[in-house]
Regions:
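Cysteine endopeptidase catalytic domains of the caspase/legumain-like
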Residues: 1-238
Length: 238
């Protein structure tokens, strides 16, 4: 069986960052929904309360997965690493930051999403996740998990990265990248503006059209012909 795994990491600080836990919960709900590809509960790990050493071990152990997603929400910054390369760093807590290089699980297919927000207006999006009940009403037996895995099979291997904002930008106070990415896509589905399978590149581009112009999300997928799936539209059949 092809093993997939999602590692969710919410930054934990002495002064908690409003909204982080809600966004991590929302990612879990989205991934396990029909639209998110029907991930199983045991494939989605919330590492937010884990020690830094345990988080590092979990990322390392994901190396042999068929597909891994690492999703971080919290404080972040861009600075040069020891070799002089600009890297985005995720602050796991007030004292420890991990670079995007360290967050790479090394599995043959992997996606890193860094929702590095400095201030977030608290808006518990998990309350709106009731809307995903729509999935179960319209699926009529369509196996979106299988559709998702078929899409992964057709993709080239490699590590892709998604950033909530471009270098020099910060996430806005009024918008959350996670919220925009998930809810914006669902609304586009309902209004018939997207096809059956939406890949990560197109999902990020959609979020970029919704977010204010001061915040430009970035997708770094390298030179690939086919991008990893992000969502399956339960309203479209083939």
């Amino acid at each position: 069986m092809k093993k997939r795994q999602a590692l969710l990491i919410g930054g934990r600080y002495r002064r908690p960052l409003a909204g982080v836990s809600a966004y991590i919960d929302a990612w879990g709900t989205f991934l396990c929904s029909s639209m998110g590809g029907c991930w199983r509960d045991d494939e989605v790990w919330d590492l937010s309360s884990w020690t830094v050493d345990d988080i590092r071990a979990a990322i390392k152990s994901a190396r042999d997965n068929f597909y891994t997603m690492v999703i971080f929400a919290g404080h972040g910054e861009v600075r040069k690493d020891q070799y002089g390369f600009l890297r985005t760093y995720a602050w796991l807590n007030d004292d420890v930051a991990m670079s995007e290089h360290e967050l790479n699980p090394g599995s043959e297919r992997a996606t890193l999403i860094m929702d590095c927000c400095r201030k977030v207006q608290l808006q518990l999006i998990n309350e709106s996740m009731e809307k995903y009940a729509l999935d179960e009403l319209v699926l009529n037996g369509v196996d979106t998990r299988k559709v998702y895995e078929n899409e992964l099979d057709m993709c080239e291997t490699g590590f892709v990265k998604v950033y909530a904002a471009d270098i020099g930008q910060s996430a806005t106070d009024d918008e959350s990248f996670s919220r925009t990415l998930i809810e914006g896509l669902r609304d586009a589905y309902v209004h018939g503006n997207m096809g059956r399978v939406v890949n990560i590149r197109d999902a990020v581009n959609l979020a970029g059209r919704i977010l204010p112009p001061q915040q430009t999300p970035v997708y770094n997928g390298g030179r690939r012909l086919k991008h990893y799936p992000f969502a399956i539209n339960p309203l479209v059949y083939e």
